[in-house]
């Protein structure tokens, strides 16, 4: 038996991504596809919490193709303005990105990403940019294989989690790979930490965790068996576990 279920590596990656420019349009495979086509690797399920963004910001989530045939045609013919779907976002939004979801972060957006511990990414489009004088590698065939058609609706792709009850573990998303919570601390709260671990990222404000001062930008892990967690102050925390 291993600490992290069926693997000896930590099951999640937590990243802060500060996109200065528009990032490439990409998609990730699921576990089954990655196992066959990527030497037994895991696929990638991830989610984004918008830490900050420009006014009237958008993000690429999903696409506008109705069938696999239309998807293939749009990609092979470079009909990117028809294919790519952008939706509006604001600070405090949460987006779940399942395998098969076309996605990309736009410039001027700061996000907290929680993901499966995998690095399998298929690049669909990179705005014809050059790297060392050459176009960056694209993964067209594999992308077409794994992209979900039709895409999840825009309305179901993003939700605002800015105004949730204070001093409680607010569940943002649960899947077989991770559980994501948002905690808005105002004054004092306690909870029992019985999960295998809990990653904690302070996304705003400052406070005290069991006597230890923390502030915006701090990351820490509450291990299994930590027991009673006492949070004090005025702060927001995004927490993740499995």
What do these predicted regions represent?
Residues 73-81, 203-208:
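Short, structured beta-strand/loop micro-motifs enriched in basic residues and often containing a Trp
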Residues 75-120:
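Loop-centered beta-sheet repeat module
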Residues 1-3:
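Short, small-residue-biased leader/transition segments that mark boundaries at the very start
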Residues 9, 17-22, 53-56, 101-121, ...:
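Ligand-binding loop in jelly-roll beta-barrel domains
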Residues 122-188, 194:
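C-terminal amphipathic alpha-helical segment
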Residues 15-19, 42-55, 63-64, 175, ...:
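Short, conserved beta-strand element in jelly-roll/cupin
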Residues 83-96, 110, 208-228:
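Short acidic-glycine-tyrosine-enriched beta hairpin
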Residues 23, 27-36, 50-56, 176-194, ...:
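Conserved short histidine dyad/triad with adjacent acidic residue
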């Amino acid at each position: 038996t291993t600490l992290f279920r069926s693997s000896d590596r930590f099951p999640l990656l937590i990243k802060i991504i500060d996109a200065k420019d528009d990032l490439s349009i990409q998609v990730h495979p699921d576990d089954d596809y990655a196992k066959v086509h990527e030497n037994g690797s895991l696929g990638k399920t991830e989610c984004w919490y918008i830490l900050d963004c420009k006014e009237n910001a958008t993000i690429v989530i999903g696409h506008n193709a109705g069938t696999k045939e239309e998807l293939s045609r749009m990609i092979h013919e470079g009909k990117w303005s028809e294919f790519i779907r952008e939706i509006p976002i604001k600070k405090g939004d949460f987006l779940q990105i399942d395998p098969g979801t076309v996605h990309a972060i736009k410039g001027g957006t700061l996000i907290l990403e929680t993901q499966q511990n995998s690095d399998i990414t298929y690049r669909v489009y990179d705005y014809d940019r050059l790297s060392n004088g050459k176009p960056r590698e694209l993964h067209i065939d594999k992308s077409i294989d794994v992209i979900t058609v039709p895409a999840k609706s825009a309305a179901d792709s993003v939700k605002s989690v800015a105004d949730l009850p204070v001093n409680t573990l607010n569940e943002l998303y649960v899947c077989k790979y991770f559980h994501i919570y948002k905690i808005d601390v105002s004054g004092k709260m306690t909870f029992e930490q019985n999960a295998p671990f809990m990653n904690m990222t302070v996304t705003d404000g400052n406070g005290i965790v069991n006597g230890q001062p923390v502030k915006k930008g701090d990351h820490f892990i509450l291990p299994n068996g930590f027991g009673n967690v006492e949070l004090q102050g005025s702060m927001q925390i995004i927490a993740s576990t499995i």
